[in-house]
Amino acid sequence: MSVKQFVSDGHIVRPYLLGLARSNPGLTVIEHDRVIYRTASAPGSGDLPKVTLVSGGGSGHEPTHAGFVGDGALDAVACGDIFASPSTKQIYSALKAVASPKGTLIIVKNYTGDIIHFGLAAERAKAAGMNVELVAVGDDVSVGKKRGALVGRRGLGATVLVHKIAGSAAALGLDLHQVAQVAQSVIDNAATIAASLDHCAVPGRKFETNLGPDEYEIGMGIHNEPGTFKSSPLPSIPELVTEMLSILFGEKNPDNSFVEFSSKDDVILLVNNMGGMSNLELGYATEVVSEQLAKRGIIPKRTMSGTFVTALNGPGFGITLVNASKATPDIFKYFDLPTTASGWNVSYHNAKDWEVLADGKVPTAPALEHTRNEKHSGVKADPKMFTKILKAAVDAINEFEPKTTWYDTIAGDGDCGTTLVNGGEAITKAINDKSIRLDDGVNGIDDLAYIVEDSMGGTSGGLYSIYLSALAKGVHESGDSELSVHTFAFASKYALDALFKYTRARKGFRTLIDAIQPFVETLNEGKGLDAAAKAATEGSEQTRKMDAVVGRASYVAKEELHKLDSEGGLPDPGAFALAAILNAIVEASEH
């Protein structure tokens, strides 16, 4: 993971709260005490009194806890320094800010500092005549029952479920004791296991880690505290999920089994990003978890996936399961109730909406099929020559892929070479499957356009597909009865003109156009295929000294584009690859 950090003195909690309130109307900040509360929950606000919920803890776990202040969730939060409990005074300030005649429930994660400070604040509030109860969230299963018998389970992902479910119960009018029971029922039936590739970086502090570059840790806490064990080499997400679930269900060691789950139980699943995982990988992990649960006969009735309880930028994720069948009877009603809390980043869905996933299967639809014209176009092609040309193009793609990728890593996003390889593999498969009409000059090229469109992503895939589609149309418009150099020259010009309708790139803009435009122009000047191929190469080479005008490379610093002085400069990867392909095509067609 990257250990670069913004320069910081570490004092960022207060401005964070102000920024949160600025972007979420209805919240008020007590700056001095680093407390944020729901404005409508304050005494005298005019709202009907209800049981209020107060939580908090060390900062660095955002959106927990402050992000869960809102209608149908928490009413106030006291924020400590990064990974440090707030003081008793801060917590008492939060309690006073939302004091209610209906009473207040304090929700705290089960960590020693939090328990002490929130417990003391609760006792002070009781002494002052306030009606308060406290519940401690402990859902971690990585530390077994024997080892953790004295301190109990740590509070992890289930914390936000307690915030939301208890908060909704309070919003619906339950009394303090009932709300506390709802919260406790979620805690008692929750199990969480987390894993991370590394420690997180704390603002204002030097990054430190005891994990090697090929190690990961199961059970790492949300304060950089050590996990239960390290392992290597780095796993795939499916491998890691298998390992995590075996611990959560006590399959690896019964001592880690705190909650029983069966195929008959209604379950809530939460897959939590610890802060540094990409949304793409998190969504992948969510599907992997769901698939592996299904193999155990467990189909969650509600699934949450997102960033809820973090360890700053921790590169890991957690899996939380709640056995809803053993929790409060109305748990799904409370779960589904809308909330304004920004941290509950789950789109609102009612119970009926969730029914579509009741069998555990995501609704899918078949791919839209391309209906192709099966009638021969009337333009003959030599199947052997067509095949030879295509194979030569694929061979060139594979041969020059490493260099294309290297160039694109410097000047772009590094996918130019692999994108072309994907297209080449699809073309090879189509040749073997006989799904390209190699005897048809129009339909065969049109087939290629669809293959490229389906297999090549990114800008280059779109450009190749447009060009090939127009090339097929150009062959048809030529009026020729069989493919020839003349036909190809006419169609190439037709295709280039079509391509120019969809891109502003022209020769000299440092794109693949610098290879294809000279090729087409030279061919249409009647100078032959060899001269056209040479022009494509020369056009590609000229990009080594050009500044990018369009495309991703236009955002890259000029000094990056001129790095490879030993080669005469850095060429445009797309032009470099296309020139190689065109040269291979010409060579194959003439020998």
Curated annotation (Swiss-Prot):
The active site is at 223 (tele-hemiaminal-histidine intermediate). It catalyses: dihydroxyacetone + ATP = dihydroxyacetone phosphate + ADP + H(+); D-glyceraldehyde + ATP = D-glyceraldehyde 3-phosphate + ADP + H(+). Keywords: ATP-binding, Glycerol metabolism, Kinase, Nucleotide-binding, Transferase. Substrate binds at residues 58-61, 109, 114. GO terms for molecular function: ATP binding; glycerone kinase activity; triokinase activity. One of its GO terms (biological process) is glycerol metabolic process. It holds the Pfam family Dak1. ATP binds at residues 413-416, 459-460, 511-512, 572-574. GO terms for cellular component: cytoplasm; cytosol. Pathway: Polyol metabolism; glycerol fermentation; glycerone phosphate from glycerol (oxidative route): step 2/2. The keyword Transmembrane helix does not apply. Its EC number is 2.7.1.28, 2.7.1.29. Residues 8-344 form the DhaK domain. Coiled coil: none annotated. The keyword DNA-binding does not apply. Residues 384-587 form the DhaL domain. Signal peptide: none annotated. Belongs to the dihydroxyacetone kinase (DAK) family. Catalyzes both the phosphorylation of dihydroxyacetone and of glyceraldehyde. NCBIfam families: dak_ATP. Seems to be missing in strain 972. This is Dihydroxyacetone kinase 2.
